[in-house]
Amino acid sequence: MNTTPVHALTDIDGGIAVDPAPRLAGPPVFGGPGNAAFDLVPVRSTGRETLRFDFPGVSVGSAHYEEGPTGATVIHIPAGARTAVDARGGAVGLSGGYDFNHAICLAGGASYGLEAGAGVSGALLERLEYRTGFAEAQLVSSAVIYDFSARSTAVYPDKALGRAALEFAVPGEFPQGRAGAGMSASAGKVDWDRTEITGQGAAFRRLGDVRILAVVVPNPVGVIMDRAGGIVRGNYDAQTGVRRHPVFDYQEAFAEQLPPVTQAGNTTISAIVTNVRMSPVELNQFAKQVHSSMHRGIQPFHTDMDGDTLFAVTTDEIDLPTTPGSSRGRLSVNATALGAIASEVMWDAVLEAAK
């Protein structure tokens, strides 16, 4: 775990000047040519760098359309895995939401991008040679971000792009940064002129036999925070070179009796995958625990202007040892400890997305 500060300097107004270099999204167009205007060809997303992870039975693929740019990222678990879904905020974009999945599809394109998940479903049916027995049904749940504000087209992830992301899926690799569903993700949308591009991020932790993989596409109203309290992405003032916590903008607006400004069209979508067996109650609480923890790295989070979804997935491969007194009612201390560790892995993933 890297806890090194990102050279943060707090000024008296609450702004935080930081390094990395700014990556402004620019004012939105909210329109432009759509899918039919282009001869769209899915591209395998490579991103800024590749995370290598050791999680047998889990593959990840990312694809995008350069013309968007927008994309889709698929987490494929051929054997299937139990899933809990935690969705919060005012504008959730979700399909499926099943408690057992063979794939999770994350995509751009707002509600239109849910079509990518249908492409994943169709491709999995083809792999079954169109067998449709109930026990063989391939389940896919999808979540989307609203990424039109960071680009000038109406291109969205369609069935072909979802299918391509699945075809590109390989074990043990995840493209970090501007790739897949994170191609046009952005953060810090108090004002469009201060919005910055993010991306998709992942982090992996192995502790003995325990494996945890976190995947996230942060596209929030809020800014991205590091563990030292520095703002590493979002709400960047190009004139002053300062990234500023939105709370100071809101405080000033209320003090001057003005309506606070916040832009609509925001979502953070994520998945936390482990091999630890949990009861349904524990898995649901695990999802809530990790999702709630993300407010440390994204501030504000779960707002009325956001639509945040987290998928908690377990492959049910190992049981953690129990100790006397480790259970209280239906909840286990083991699941609580796992959630605490997974929360740190997810924060690492958020920071990777912001690099």
Swiss-Prot record:
Domain of life: Bacteria
Keywords linked to the UniProt accession: Hydrolase, Nylon degradation
Active site feature: 267 (nucleophile)
InterPro entries for this protein: ArgJ-like_dom_sf (IPR016117), Peptidase_S58_DmpA (IPR005321)
Reactions this protein catalyses: [N-(6-aminohexanoyl)]n + H2O = [N-(6-aminohexanoyl)]n-x + [N-(6-aminohexanoyl)]x
Main EC class the enzyme belongs to: hydrolase
Gene Ontology BP annotations: nylon catabolic process
Any Pfam family matching the protein: Peptidase_S58
Enzyme Commission number, as recorded: 3.5.1.117
Pathway noted in the entry: Xenobiotic degradation; nylon-6 oligomer degradation
GO MF term (any one): aminopeptidase activity
pH dependence text: Optimum pH is 7.0-8.5.
Signal sequence range: none
PTM section of the record: Expressed as an inactive precursor that is cleaved autocatalytically at Asn266/Thr267 to generate an active enzyme composed of an alpha subunit and a beta subunit.
Family per similarity comment: Belongs to the peptidase S58 family.
Subunit details: Heterotetramer composed of 4 alpha/beta heterodimers.
Record function comment: Involved in the degradation of nylon-6 oligomers. Degrades cyclic and linear oligomers of 6-aminohexanoate (Ahx) with a degree of polymerization greater than three by an endo-type mode. Cannot use Ahx cyclic dimer or the Ahx linear dimer.
Record protein name field: 6-aminohexanoate-oligomer endohydrolase
Organism: Kocuria sp. (strain KY2)
